Amino acid sequence: MTYLFYTAAALAEIAGCFSVWAWWRLERSPLWLAPGFVSLLLFAWLLALVDTNAAGRAYAAYGGIYIAASLAWLWLVEGVRPDRWDLAGAALCIAGASLILLAPRGA
């Protein structure tokens, strides 16, 4: 369930941030901001649902999922294919996030 929350949170955060990007950098209508802010609220709520006793650990583990989702967004929404350096960097981050998320604790 944790991965589901992280993935949904990443999509909500990226969509929310992209709405600001679209308004500011792509000169889209300010109406883009309303669903963006709702999306950012959804992001925060979803991340708070992660089952952990330390917020910082949840955020650190989330980072790897966020990077992978950002590269998927880059490719699927923006039409820019990630290069080998993007993919290598994402692999390192996902490995680190997995270590944080799956490490045996309390031993």
Curated annotation (Swiss-Prot):
Keyword Cell inner membrane among record annotations:
yes
The superkingdom listed in its UniProt entry is Bacteria
Looking at the UniProt entry, the stretches that span the membrane are 4-24, 30-50, 60-80, 87-107
Q: How does it sit in the membrane?
A: Multi-pass membrane protein
Main localization is membrane
- Entry keyword set: Cell inner membrane, Cell membrane, Membrane, Transmembrane, Transmembrane helix
Where in the cell is the protein located? Cell inner membrane
* GO terms for cellular component: plasma membrane
- Which family, according to the similarity comment? Belongs to the UPF0060 family.
Q: Which PANTHER family match?
A: UPF0060 MEMBRANE PROTEIN YNFA
- By what name is this protein known? UPF0060 membrane protein mll7841
Specify the species. Mesorhizobium japonicum (strain LMG 29417 / CECT 9101 / MAFF 303099) (Mesorhizobium loti (strain MAFF 303099))
Q: Taxonomically, what lineage is the organism? A: Bacteria, Pseudomonadati, Pseudomonadota, Alphaproteobacteria, Hyphomicrobiales
